[in-house]
Amino acid sequence: MDWFMGKGRRKDNSKDSPTPPVPEEARQYLEDSCVRERVTDADFYKLVALPPSVDYNEWLATHSISFFNHVNLMYGVISEYCTSESCPSMTGPGNVQFLWYDDKGKKYKNTAPQYVDYLTTYVQKQISDESSYPTKFGQPFPNSLEATTKKCHRLLFHVLAHMYHAHYSDCVTLGIHGHLNSLFTHFMVFNIKFDLMEDKETEILQDLLEALVKQLPDPNQNDDKETSEVTRS
């Protein structure tokens, strides 16, 4: 993922609880000129395909860590615009709201920066845990790796959804909307390739995903016969 460049900065369990969407708002990121913005012409279908000699768990863990770092960097670029005053709740397109659940299952409505701090700490804790994401050669991966990865990716999706919903104009002003599109496309093609997220978890950005993947080479023409379609009926 060397195509991404950015700078950034930046509490533990979560079950997201999106609220029903409200009437449609203007979505600048769906405009043709915005959809065409990207920083790479890479074929993400081929890029995410599991190489024959690579272990699936290793592929999953490596990408999860990389996606976390890149989403964290991207959010860091616009974090000064994401404040408790500007973003009193963690929302996505359609004003879908994400609620945080603590260890006891109690849900909380947080400001967006609080929510991002919580999920950043949670994901960082998971990927830094040798029992969850082992880094030593020969150390086996736990059976729970895929489930942990799914949860982490769901949380990372919330950050991307919030950026498109609440900070897309900031991204345009800073000239990073092409980076955001490329990161989101890579992230989603990987998730769908390995069935890491459910449709209901990502439907708030399905229109954007379909528009973005139209810019990619036809996956049916790839050499990799097992590559999946991203656009779903």
Positions of PLM-derived features:
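Helix N-terminus capping/helix-initiation residues
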Residues: 55, 110-111, 198
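Generic detector of well-ordered alpha-helical segments enriched in charged/polar residues
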Residues: 65-79, 116-120, 124, 181-184, ...
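Amphipathic alpha-helical interface segments within eukaryotic helical scaffold
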Residues: 72-149, 153, 157-165
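Chromatin/DNA-recognition segments of nuclear transcriptional regulators
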Residues: 146-162, 166-197
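Eukaryote-biased recognition of C-terminal alpha-helical segments
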Residues: 176-233
